[in-house]
């Protein structure tokens, strides 16, 4: 039995969101990211996110300028300009809190990925709360805020350590032309290259 069998409106909304993002081959959107570690001040960053199926994404940060997060479908690269350091990790091994967004790069299926799905109206928008189906992920809960046009406007991820990472999206473009080179990490001159965990 479906986790929301009694809520046809929520089920219809989820199917609409799935259809919107599953049809897209590429996506471009502006993001604002708030990260709040436990017991510490919130950190706000922003920039442009581009996605290409399967498994490729690029986060170009305007704030802090020069920060870069790239997935070529196999590896994730995180470049921090303050340290002039590039860290590489395997996509499946990443416990980065951006990873929950990776499902947008594949076949979005709320029922497959999440459990305890619930919806709550907030004006013209709906807040969907869910938990990951597997305990092997570094987060315990995910919230999506979805508009009447089935666009995901907000994704909030809560980690097991009670940290929160919230993304707000605007200016979404579905299926823009994207240069394949966007998803190939090019290390800036003199950057220190390290493997994750070293």
Task: Provide a role label for each language-model segment.
Residues 48-99, 165-166:
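An acidic-aromatic
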Residues 3-7:
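Boundary at the C-terminal end of the N-terminal hydrophobic targeting segment
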Residues 12, 87, 112-198:
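Gly/Pro-enriched, hydrophobic low-complexity segments
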Residues 16, 21-73:
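N-terminal mature ectodomain segment of secretory-pathway/periplasmic proteins
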Residues 39, 82-84, 161:
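Solvent-exposed strand-loop boundary residues in beta-sheet-rich modules
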Residues 101-117:
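Anionic-ligand binding region
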């Amino acid at each position: 039995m479906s986790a929301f069998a009694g809520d046809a409106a929520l089920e219809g909304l989820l199917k609409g969101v799935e259809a919107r993002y599953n049809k897209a081959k590429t996506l471009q959107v502006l993001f604002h990211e708030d990260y709040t570690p436990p017991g510490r001040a919130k950190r706000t960053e922003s920039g442009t996110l581009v996605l290409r199926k399967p498994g490729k994404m690029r986060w170009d940060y305007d704030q802090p300028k020069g920060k870069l997060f790239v997935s070529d479908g196999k590896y994730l690269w995180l470049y921090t300009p303050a340290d002039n350091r590039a860290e590489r990790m395997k996509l499946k091994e990443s416990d980065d809190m951006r990873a929950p967004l990776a499902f947008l790069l594949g076949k979005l299926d709320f029922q497959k990925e999440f459990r305890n799905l619930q919806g709550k109206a907030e004006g013209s928008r709906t807040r969907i709360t869910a938990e990951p189906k597997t305990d092997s992920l570094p987060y315990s809960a995910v919230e999506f805020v979805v508009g009447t046009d089935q666009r995901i406007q907000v994704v909030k991820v809560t980690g097991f350590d009670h940290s929160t990472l919230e993304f707000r999206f605007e200016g979404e473009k579905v299926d823009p032309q994207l240069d394949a080179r966007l998803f190939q990490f090019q290390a800036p001159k003199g950057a220190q290259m390290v493997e994750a965990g070293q």
